[in-house]
Amino acid sequence: MEYLTIALSSYLLGSIPFGFILTKIFLKKDIRNIGSGNIGATNALRTGNKTLGYATLFLDITKAVLPVLYVKFNYPDYIFIASLSAFLGHLFPIWLKFKGGKGVATYVGILLSINYILGLIFIISWIVTFLLSKYSSLSSLVASLIIPVYLIIFENFNSFFFIIMFVLIFYTHRENVKRLKNKEESKTKIY
């Protein structure tokens, strides 16, 4: 029963579409009709309201931190269930007919909660890649790949869970990958 309660509550928290909600409240627009149509932080930045974009980023990270930290300290055997459930909630939110974000900010929240070192590795990798390329999508893919590689090489750790997360992030970025390959991807302004 704990397993199901943790999975469901983590999914529901992860499925709160903050980019959609904030854009509706403050801009009176549907974020799904702006930029890429995605509900996440990068597209929230494309609304032209940087504060809204950063608020979306913070809230999308937080909605993973809350259930994962709670489970980490109270039901540690279920930490990966809580993590995956929150992540899937963001990707496939019940509130938006299962059409959600790409999962990067939520993944950062998961990493920071499981082991803040992993979160910092992700963030630093993302920033370095972004400074070199100006592509948010490429930065997300590189940083997501670095986590399981780091764990395999330096921690001798079973990184199956993190490989699954990378595959899901790659899947959500499949259109970005095509645009990157064809040199049609838009660069992102984050400041």
Predicted segments with their positions:
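Cytosolic, membrane-interface loops and tails of multi-pass inner-membrane proteins
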Residues: 20-53, 176-191
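Multi-pass membrane proteins that catalyze or facilitate reactions on polyprenyl-/lipid-phosphate substrates
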Residues: 2, 6, 15, 136-191
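N-terminal signal-anchor transmembrane alpha helix
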Residues: 2-26
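Interfacial segments of multi-pass membrane proteins
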Residues: 45-48, 67, 71-75, 89, ...
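Nucleotide and nucleotide-moiety/phosphate-recognizing core
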Residues: 6, 52-54, 62-93, 126-127
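Short, non-helical or kinked segments that cap or interrupt transmembrane helices
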Residues: 30-38, 96-106, 135-143
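Transmembrane alpha-helix interface/packing and boundary motifs in multi-pass membrane proteins
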Residues: 11-15, 24, 87-97, 130-134
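Hydrophobic alpha-helical transmembrane segments
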Residues: 4-9, 53-54, 79-84, 120-124, ...
